[in-house]
Each structure stands twice: as structure tokens, then as C-alpha cells.
């Protein structure tokens, strides 16, 4: 069988570029979930050491922040290790205002909690309403308090020493 030298040269040229095993393909970049899964497995191992128990039938969780906003977990997983005073909440939090959650929270609370919550809400509303009104007035008073009164014949050097 005769071998065509042109075809042979062409094939050799192609094989020089492609090396043995075919064309080289770039690998897809791994996403950040691999490290997140690694962190989760470490966390699960630590919780296993603490003998944490999974709490079932927890539908939602709310964490109240100092600034009046609430971290709301709609679908939440909870693990508790009471002997170590440790609770773990899994889920995606949504930051909401207290007024948004009032209708859904009130049926779940007892009478004492409702009273405390209404007092907290009124305090927050009063603080928010009073803050813009007093900002300008307090700034003016502060400037007046920082400036000492000048009295003829007295110097302030004696007070410093």
C-alpha cells in the first residue's frame, strides 16, 4: 500500500500539536460550595462531639437585633446540646422590620410576652420619632456647653495648671 507523503506530514504536524491522548481541555473552575461543604462537615463533627440533638417541627425562628430589625428564618433546622448550652440554627435569614412580623408573631405569644413586645414597639417608635426632632437642638446645646464664658479680668491659665 503506497503512503502519501503529504498526508503523512499533515498527520505528523497535527499529532505534534495534540500530544498523546487527544486535545487538552480546560477544567471547569470549582465553585465555592466545596469549601462550604468542608466547613459544614467540620461543624457537624463538632456537634457530634457535643452530642447535639436535632429538634424537629421547628417552623421558624426570629432573632431580635438591638437596632429594631429582626433576623427571620422561615425554614430552619435546629440542633441543641443543652448540657453545653449550645443551639445551632440552619437556614437562610431574611432581615425584616419588627412591624412586618407583628401579625405572625402575636398569635404565638402569651399575654406577658405580648405586653413586653408592645412596650418595646412603642419605645422604638418614640425613639425614632424623637431622634429627628432633637438632633438639631442637641447639637446647638453641645456647642454652647463646649464654649466657656469669658469674664473680664479672668484668665483660664490658672484652671489648666
Swiss-Prot record:
Transmembrane segments: none annotated. Residues 125-134 have a biased composition (Low complexity). Gene3D superfamilies: Nascent polypeptide-associated complex domain (2.20.70.30). InterPro entries: BTF3, NAC_A/B_dom_sf, Nas_poly-pep-assoc_cplx_dom. Keywords: Cytoplasm, Nucleus, Protein transport, Repressor, Transcription, Transcription regulation, Transport. The keyword Transcription applies. Residues 37-102 form the NAC-A/B domain. Residues 14-41, 125-161 are annotated as: Disordered. Residues 135-146 have a biased composition (Basic and acidic residues). Part of the nascent polypeptide-associated complex (NAC), consisting of EGD2 and EGD1. NAC associates with ribosomes via EGD1. Belongs to the NAC-beta family. This is Nascent polypeptide-associated complex subunit beta. The lineage of its organism: Eukaryota, Fungi, Dikarya, Ascomycota, Saccharomycotina. The gene is EGD1.
